[in-house]
Amino acid sequence: MSTRTASAGDIKEGSYIMIDNMPCRVVEVEKSKTGKHGSAKARIVGIGVIDGVKRTIVVPTDAAVEVPVIEKFTAQVISISGDSVQLMDLRNYQTFEIPSSYIEDEAKGKLEPGVQVEVWDVAGYKKIMRTR
């Protein structure tokens, strides 16, 4: 699981952060003003990249948050079974399986053996994002 740290005040909409140990794409950021006895807070709302679940985190703007390192690579579909897809990584020719729940909706109908797909490896999770 490769991550780096960033300040919560520097997070923008469209970026990616880890919320509850799941990689999420940030869809909303609200920053409150500094109070009389406290620091400014950031309310960050994200949608899970892997599972699509909406998650919220409230942290001080100077707090460090984890930002996942997203590795994108091309793979070829070898076979499709009922609940998983077997792929071959075109960089090193290793085979691996991805559950059907980790396939983006727009790519589900286009999968067949021999098709090349773009795979995202985020925090140890692999997900098929689109066909090539």
UniProtKB/Swiss-Prot annotation:
Q: Give the matching Pfam families.
A: eIF-5a, IF5A-like_N
What subcellular compartments does it reside in? Answer: Cytoplasm
Would you kindly state one Gene Ontology biological process term found in this protein's UniProt entry? positive regulation of translational elongation
The Gene Ontology CC terms held by the record are:
cytoplasm
Q: Which UniProt keywords apply?
A: Cytoplasm, Hypusine, Initiation factor, Protein biosynthesis
Q: Which residues carry this modification: Hypusine?
A: 36
Major site of localization recorded for this protein: cytoplasm
Q: Which SMART domains match?
A: eIF-5a (SM01376)
Any idea which GO molecular function terms this record carries? ribosome binding; RNA binding; translation elongation factor activity; translation initiation factor activity
Q: Quick check: keyword Membrane in the entry?
A: no
Q: Which family does it belong to?
A: Belongs to the eIF-5A family.
Matches recorded under NCBIfam families: eIF_5A, PRK03999.1
Function noted in UniProt: Functions by promoting the formation of the first peptide bond.
Q: Kindly give the PANTHER family that the UniProt entry links to this protein.
A: TRANSLATION INITIATION FACTOR 5A FAMILY MEMBER (PTHR11673)
What is the protein's name according to its record? Translation initiation factor 5A
Name the source organism. Caldivirga maquilingensis (strain ATCC 700844 / DSM 13496 / JCM 10307 / IC-167)
- Encoding gene (name): eIF5A
